[in-house]
């Protein structure tokens, strides 16, 4: 027999699958459907690394298995191709971004096809295609019409080098994640999406979906819903109130100072009264260099200034309390002001110690000698006037009643979640389909005029004042108002990369439809997505944004379900062989092209699934790759053992055990243990002189989702009918997964003396008869009387003698 040569085999089968559209999703909507989705990649210039195929292979395995179980499987792929890295590369190398994107996509697709994924390539999408982003723009217009898109001046993280705004997550230690430059705070007029209107539903509807618990927790924590009250503190010097949000209204008697954000409007409104205004403005300039994450870091030293000229009045004690400005209070959370209770909050305690501010404990048992007393969910109130002696819960309710009765506050639900900044001052993104008219204000384009196509420009760099390159194209900017026909100007900001990825799963259901996002018939049949797998790094922003868009589309009658994904799982990273994250700078990146060339795509697929627990990170090991290649070499050689007349019964129990374990493990993401079971079965095959065609056929079907090329090739060589992918998935008989013959331990007076082979259902007399024939057991029974026999069926047999 010729040697296993994956290079020729794999090209042959990939060509067959492509030419025959083997994995094209059927239009037959009478079949039960299975929609499997993996996050579509950003097509970078570096191409795929070995981390990419891990999730793709995982859901490819599930998809191939489900096809053999009779499902109509939708398993698509596309490209999340807008984004800053492409634009920066285009600027640096003087190449058009669309050319860069096209080349990168070609490379990514070539790599994916070389690994043998069963994607339906007829449904391929690209977020930079005008036929695609026409519908991204359409969704934005619907949001605008419903009041969910609005423009607002707000402070943002600004990178002077990249000349663009950055999300908090893109700022590392005060520097831009992309270029390393110093980030500053800058006020910009930005388009916002009102995701906060959906905050409660985004939390409450998680009960209806099957997500990993840690994914649900991340979503809930990111939204940060908290119940409390807004309370007004009067300002002594002027007719003004400072409003705070607090979850602990019961502790207000312990509020000994207030802190407002450096951006709080009161500072400039009363700048003429603030004696140290220059000092505060200088401090604000320093704070502008920090990200919000840095400003709220609990471990950093507390900084700030007392505002000389504004004093607050505690509405419960009527005492005057100082007002400070500090970086740890954010204008974008709550009201931009806090009442500080230093006896019971770590940050307030550190701040109060530094500025020598009074501390008043209000919970019984508080020891604040060395630190704040923060175990305050239980206990009774002290130093709190009419709340004294009440429990924490009783005191909260009493205080809510009091502030509403006295009209100094009210109960309120608050969220950490902020509205979504939706503008980017860059070129390579979807144009925002709005124009500004002096008479009509902001007006959306007519739907018949979509898509608003991104115009070609000679220079992709943002302007020095931070405007998009589109602002320099006069014939793009100047237009007519769609409403009144007068002169108007277009919005020149573009959408963020998140836009196209917030609804792409819907387009896969009907990717060539030019009348709608997708037909109602297709959306009703294919959605929601049955199983979505992606990285843990995307379980907050991307998952939250797409759930928000989906809920909006549900509200306007476009989609049939409240949630986009019924199941969400995540995978661990593949690390370098030194246990560090793969990166060019560390020199530990492994290119899948090299593995496919040297070992074969099936070896790569097998190793990626055998490397360890799918949900956990695992280091790459070339020895592990070689081990999987040896396994496939052994699979190849096992053809020689097949004899059509061999006895099937000899291996029947192990075969049924393997069908059961592999079937369950594939669905439970336990690919490593499924492959280990297949290795066990293969070893047992090789311990026999011959195996039956039926046994080997079952083995090939079970292995096919992991290693589709070698199994199809052997299948054809063995003369089995049709193709593996057309076969029915084998079913197991539960009764046949249990061994009829077992090894039973035999004890004499509680001590193990032997084991005997016995039928699992053997009676006590049958076991005894077999046991006494064992030479060792017989020796311990000589000249003894058997007084008792203890038989735990299928477990142990104990003979008591005297």
Swiss-Prot record:
Keyword S-adenosyl-L-methionine (UniProt): no
Record has Lyase as a keyword: no
Enzyme class of the recorded protein, top EC level: ligase
Motif 'HIGH' region mapped to chain: 41-52
A single cellular component GO annotation: cytosol
Domain of life assignment: Bacteria
GO biological process: leucyl-tRNA aminoacylation
GO molecular function ontology, one term from the record: ATP binding
Short motif 'KMSKS' region, span: 581-585
EC number(s) recorded for this UniProt protein: 6.1.1.4
Record Gene3D superfamilies: 3.10.20.590, HUPs, Isoleucyl-tRNA Synthetase, Domain 1
Catalyzed reactions per annotation: tRNA(Leu) + L-leucine + ATP = L-leucyl-tRNA(Leu) + AMP + diphosphate
Pfam families membership: Anticodon_1, tRNA-synt_1, tRNA-synt_1_2
Residues holding ATP: 584
Keywords: Aminoacyl-tRNA synthetase, ATP-binding, Cytoplasm, Ligase, Nucleotide-binding, Protein biosynthesis
Compartmental location: Cytoplasm
PANTHER family xrefs: LEUCINE--TRNA LIGASE, MITOCHONDRIAL, LEUCYL-TRNA SYNTHETASE
Entry similarity comment: Belongs to the class-I aminoacyl-tRNA synthetase family.
Protein name according to UniProt: Leucine--tRNA ligase
Gene source species: Finegoldia magna (strain ATCC 29328 / DSM 20472 / WAL 2508) (Peptostreptococcus magnus)
GN (gene name): leuS
């Amino acid at each position: 027999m010729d040697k296993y040569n994956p290079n020729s085999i794999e090209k042959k089968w990939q060509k067959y699958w492509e030419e025959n559209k083997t994995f094209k999703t059927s239009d037959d909507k009478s079949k039960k459907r299975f929609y499997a989705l993996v996050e579509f990649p950003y097509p970078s210039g570096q191409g795929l690394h070995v981390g990419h195929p891990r999730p793709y292979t995982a859901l490819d395995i599930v998809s191939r298995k489900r096809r053999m179980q009779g499902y109509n499987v939708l398993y698509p792929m596309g490209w999340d191709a807008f984004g800053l890295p492409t634009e920066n590369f285009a600027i640096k190398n003087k190449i058009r971004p669309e050319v860069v994107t096209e080349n990168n996509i070609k490379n990514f697709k070539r790599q994916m096809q070389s690994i043998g994924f069963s994607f339906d390539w007829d449904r391929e999408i690209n977020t930079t295609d005008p036929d695609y982003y026409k519908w991204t723009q359409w969704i934005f217009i619907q949001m605008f019409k419903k009041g969910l898109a609005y423009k607002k001046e707000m402070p943002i993280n600004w990178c002077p080098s990249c000349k663009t705004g950055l999300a908090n997550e893109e700022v590392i230690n005060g520097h831009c994640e992309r270029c390393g430059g110093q980030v500053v705070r800058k006020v910009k007029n930005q388009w916002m999406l009102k995701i906060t209107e959906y905050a409660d539903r985004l939390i409450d509807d998680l009960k209806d979906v099957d997500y990993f618990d840690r994914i649900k927790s991340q979503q809930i924590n990111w939204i940060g819903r908290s119940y409390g009250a807004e309370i007004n503190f009067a300002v002594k010097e002027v007719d003004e109130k400072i409003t705070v949000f607090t979850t602990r209204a019961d502790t207000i008697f312990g509020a000994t100072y207030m802190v407002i954000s450096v951006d709080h409007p009161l500072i400039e409104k009363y700048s003429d009264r603030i004696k140290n205004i220059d000092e505060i403005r200088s401090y604000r300039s320093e704070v502008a260099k920090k990200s919000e994450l840095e400003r709220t870091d609990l471990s950093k030293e507390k900084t700030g200034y007392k505002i000389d000229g504004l004093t607050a009045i505690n509405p419960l004690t009527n005492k005057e309390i100082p007002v400070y400005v500090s970086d740890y209070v954010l204008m974008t959370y709550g009201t931009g002001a806090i009442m500080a209770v230093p006896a019971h909050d770590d940050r307030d305690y550190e701040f109060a110690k530094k500025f020598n501010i009074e501390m008043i404990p209000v919970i019984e048992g508080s020891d604040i000698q060395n630190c704040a007393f923060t175990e305050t969910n239980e206990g009774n109130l002290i130093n709190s006037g009419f709340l004294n002696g009440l429990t924490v819960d009783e005191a909260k309710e009493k205080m809510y009643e009091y502030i509403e009765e006295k009209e100094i506050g009210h109960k309120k639900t608050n969220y950490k979640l902020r509205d979504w900044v939706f503008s980017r001052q860059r070129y390579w993104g979807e144009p925002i389909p709005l124009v500004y008219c002096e008479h009509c204000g902001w007006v959306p384009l007519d739907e018949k005029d979509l898509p608003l196509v991104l115009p070609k420009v000679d220079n992709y760099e943002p302007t020095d004042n931070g405007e998009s390159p589109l602002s320099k194209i006069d014939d793009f900017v100047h237009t007519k108002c769609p409403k009144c026909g007068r002169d108007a100007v277009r919005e020149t900001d573009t959408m963020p990369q998140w836009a196209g990825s917030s609804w792409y799963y819907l387009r896969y259901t009907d990717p060539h439809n030019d009348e709608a996002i997708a037909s109602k018939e297709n959306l009703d049949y294919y959605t929601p997505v049955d199983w979505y797998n992606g990285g843990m790094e995307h379980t907050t922003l991307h998952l939250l944004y797409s759930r928000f868009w989906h809920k909006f589309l549900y509200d306007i009658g476009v989609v049939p379900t409240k949630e986009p994904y019924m199941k969400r799982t995540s995978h661990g990273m593949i690390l370098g062989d030194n246990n560090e994250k793969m990166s060019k700078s560390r020199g530990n990146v492994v290119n899948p092209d090299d593995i496919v060339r040297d070992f074969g795509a099936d070896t790569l697929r097998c190793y990626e699934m055998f490397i360890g627990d799918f949900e956990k990170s695992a280091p790459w090991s070339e020895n592990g790759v070689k081990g999987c290649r040896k396994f496939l070499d052994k699979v190849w050689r096992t053809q020689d053992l097949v004899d059509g007349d061999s006895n099937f019964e000899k291996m029947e129990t192990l075969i049924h055990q393997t069908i059961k374990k592999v079937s369950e493990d594939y669905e439970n993401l336990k690919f490593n243990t499924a492959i280990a079971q297949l290795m066990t079965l293969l070893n047992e095959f090789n311990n026999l002189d011959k195996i039956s065609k039926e046994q080997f056929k079952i083995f090939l079907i079970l292995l096919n989702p992991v290693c589709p090329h070698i199994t199809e090739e052997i299948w054809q060589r063995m003369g089995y009918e049709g193709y593996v992918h057309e076969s029915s998935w084998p079913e197991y008989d539960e009764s046949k997964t249990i061994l009829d013959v077992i090894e039973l331990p035999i004890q004499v007076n509680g001590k193990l003396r032997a084991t005997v082979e016995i039928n699992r259902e053997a009676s006590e007399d049958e076991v005894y008869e077999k046991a006494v024939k064992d030479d060792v057991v017989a020796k311990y029974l000589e000249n003894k009387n058997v007084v008792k026999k203890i038989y735990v069926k299928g477990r142990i047999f104990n003979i008591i003698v005297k």
